[in-house]
Swiss-Prot record:
Protein name (database record): Uncharacterized protein ECU05_0590
Residues glycosylated per entry: 225, 242
Signal recorded as keyword: yes
Organism: Encephalitozoon cuniculi (strain GB-M1)
Record keywords, A-Z: Glycoprotein, Signal
Signal sequence range: 1-15
UniProt keyword Glycoprotein present: yes
């Protein structure tokens, strides 16, 4: 998933936020995400044009809103991490710009090994890595991220209770699959980030970078899931609109 696609997705998340006037979360600003080459920005097309995003803002889907809010909270930490990995591992950068959502075990091991070798001489406690990804800020944000994801699961369960078995069956089935995948992938990312933090705090430095690489790999899948959820939400909104118009025309 490219930087442009990531920015489009967070734009969608912000549109969702704007559709709920009573909610105004604070997002920590960051200027760390600076891809090293223009090719990184141009390697993949936009998934949604700006005018599509403005239309998407009318969608009032509580689950999609919750997912968008979680994505927005997670985005700064993950862009700092993926920026670091792209800058320090050519192999990771090539994979991240590719369409693939899966990295082979051998490639992942090579990425991790290469990242350790890329650390400055004498930096055994990974100070440069920790500083670049703003590890202390991540420690502060993890509880909020876990709380946000827990609330999202509650919203998801409530919305499913409201939905009849037959309602929008084909679209809803695909949407539920995407939401389950999003939720599972999101928890995996938070578990990996937490493990990396724990190992660093325990001074087990040889097991710090690996969990962060796992989190970055999973984040690419999360972005893919989120883009599918956006598409499903638009499809369901269109279905509702068309059904309402047909009912109105029969009166």
């Amino acid at each position: 998933m490219s930087a442009i696609s990531s920015l489009v997705l967070i734009g969608w998340a912000m549109c969702l936020e704007n559709s709920y006037k009573y909610y105004d979360p604070v997002l920590q600003p960051t200027n760390f995400y600076k891809p090293s080459t223009a090719a990184f920005l141009e390697s993949r097309p936009l998934m949604f044009a700006p005018e599509q995003l403005s239309r998407n803002a009318i969608l009032h889907n509580p689950v999609a809103f919750g997912e968008g809010n979680f994505y927005k909270l997670l985005y700064p930490s993950m862009t700092r991490l993926t920026s670091y990995l792209n800058d320090h591992s050519p192999l990771f950068g090539d994979w991240y710009r590719s369409p693939s959502l899966i990295m082979s075990k051998s490639d992942k091991e090579e990425v991790i090994s290469g990242l350790y070798k890329a650390q400055p001489k004498g930096d055994k406690d990974l100070k440069e890595f920790w500083g670049f990804i703003m590890g202390e800020l991540l420690i502060r944000d993890l509880p909020e991220l876990k709380k946000s994801l827990g609330e999202l699961k509650g919203i998801q369960n409530e919305e499913r209770k409201k939905k009849s078995v037959a309602e929008f069956k084909d679209i809803a089935d695909q949407k539920d699959n995407d939401e389950n995948s999003f939720f599972g992938t999101a928890w995996f990312i938070l578990d990996c980030l937490s493990l990396g933090v724990s190992n660093r705090n325990a001074e087990i430095y040889g097991d710090v970078i690996g969990p962060f690489v796992d989190a970055a790999i999973a984040f690419k899948s999360l972005e893919h899931n989120f883009s599918n959820i956006i598409g499903s939400s638009r499809s369901m909104s269109s279905y509702r609109t068309n059904s309402t118009e047909q009912i109105g025309s029969k009166k």
